[in-house]
Every structure is written in structure tokens, then in C-alpha cells.
């Protein structure tokens, strides 16, 4: 059904976070600090992996791409949110809104596929250790990353092109801090049945299929760990998978809470808070999870500091 007062929308208004005006300064400082830590922390992970030859392995190859994706995902939404807090200008041009939506979907999907590739890498390393170097060659790693980029781009582009066909009503207020696809569809005056079909089929598949692959990989890993002949083998396997499993639990736990649990009357605020979790909090915590729980990363960090100390003398 078409709404009244249909018009051509040139810009949208983002309502930002559900916080009181007197809290703006506190939250601006908080989110600015978290964003800077996210960028610097993930850049440090990338730098360590590039500079330290001990980290030139498939697992850290995928981790470097995940760190870059985390930086990009936060950069799609957080700077605009901070600018709105500082200037009180909540408007965003139509083209800018569609562009933000595209890259948000793109990097969210890319996170899913990279986490799946990392789970497969851990599966091969633990379940088939003697064949690990034979299977996880550079060509396969590059192929997995390339396919992840292509699938993410294709899915994001399909949603963007379908959205571009829609008309929007006079109501241009988005109850979110970024241009969320579902929120945009609610503002449309056009028939959105095709958009909803793509979301519930392709969109859901992009979330559920990688998660199923990760669960299957860790199911095989769990069986292998239980069959390990010594306690040392079990602890080594757990330390190898611990960081990745923590990130997977944090990321997909938020996604499941957002899309699969029953909605409440404050569903709009719930969506905003959940979005903050996987666009701000998860990218922020990932470098700490990998540096605190991974001895290789901590060793590379120590070697980098020692090298810097020697050069400064």
C-alpha cells in the first residue's frame, strides 16, 4: 500500500544513539576513544603480521584480512556518528546513505566469510596436521579471501540495486545511527516484497551458512581433541582455537540476539544497541582477544619492542 505525501527524498535524518542531550559529550569521548583504539589495535595486528616472519602462516594471513575488515566496518559508521554528535547535524545525503548501507553490508558479510575461512584453517591444522602445509597452500588462502570478497560484494550490490529502485515518502527519519537496510525499507512507499524476499533468503544464507560451517568445523575439532592421546595435545589445540572461538562467539552471539530472539516493545533501541556491539565493540575487542590469548602474537609484539629499543639506542 502506498503512503500519502510521497515525494523525492534527497536526504535522510539519522536519530543517532538513544541517549540524553546532556550525555552527548560523554558518549562522544567514549566512542572516539574506542574508535581510535580499534583502528590502532587492528593496525598493530596487521603490522606485526607483515613484519614478523614467524607470523607468515595461513591463520595469521586470514587474521590480517579480518583486522582490516574490522577497521573498515567501524569506519563506515562511527565517524559519521561522531560528526553528528559534535555538530548536531543528523542529515545524510541520499547517495551517502546508500553508499554507507552498501559498505556496511559488504564488510559485515566479509567478516562472516573470513571467520569461516579461519575455522576451516583450524580444522585442517588440528584434524589433519600432517597434511596441513599441503592443503593450506598460498593459492588456496588467496582463493578463499578472493571468494569472500566477491560473495560479499555481490550480496551488498544486490541489496543496493534493489533499494535504488524504491521510492521514499516524506518521512525521511531513520531511527538508527547509520543507514540500516531494514530501517530504510520501512520508509519506502514502494512494494518491498522483492527486497524482503532477498533479505530472508540470500541475506539469511550469508549469516547461517557460514555459522553452520564454523559449527561443523569445531564439531570435528572437538572430536579430535577428545581423542587426543595426551593432555598436552588437548591444551595445545584449545590454545590454538581459543582466540578464534572467542571472536566467533562474540560476533554471532550479537547477531543471534538481534535477528533470532523475540522482539520487545523497545525493538528499535535493541537494534541500535546490538548494532553498536558488532560495529564498535567487537572490532575493538578483537585485537585484545588475539594478543592476550595468542602466544605467537605476544611473541611478535615483544620482538617488535626489542627491535625498536635496539634501534633507539
UniProtKB/Swiss-Prot annotation:
Membrane is among the record's keywords: yes
Entry keyword Nucleotide-binding: no
Record-level GO cellular component terms: plasma membrane
Family in the record: Belongs to the G-protein coupled receptor 1 family.
Location in the cell: Cell membrane
Gene name tied to this protein: OR1J4
Originating organism: Homo sapiens
Glycosylation sites: 5
UniProt protein name: Olfactory receptor 1J4
GO function terms (MF aspect): G protein-coupled receptor activity; olfactory receptor activity
Cystine bridges: 97-189
Function: Odorant receptor.
Topological domains annotated Extracellular: 1-25, 80-100, 159-195, 260-272
PROSITE patterns listed in its UniProt record: G_PROTEIN_RECEP_F1_1, G_PROTEIN_RECEP_F1_2
Keyword set, alphabetical order: Cell membrane, Disulfide bond, G-protein coupled receptor, Glycoprotein, Membrane, Olfaction, Receptor, Sensory transduction, Transducer, Transmembrane, Transmembrane helix
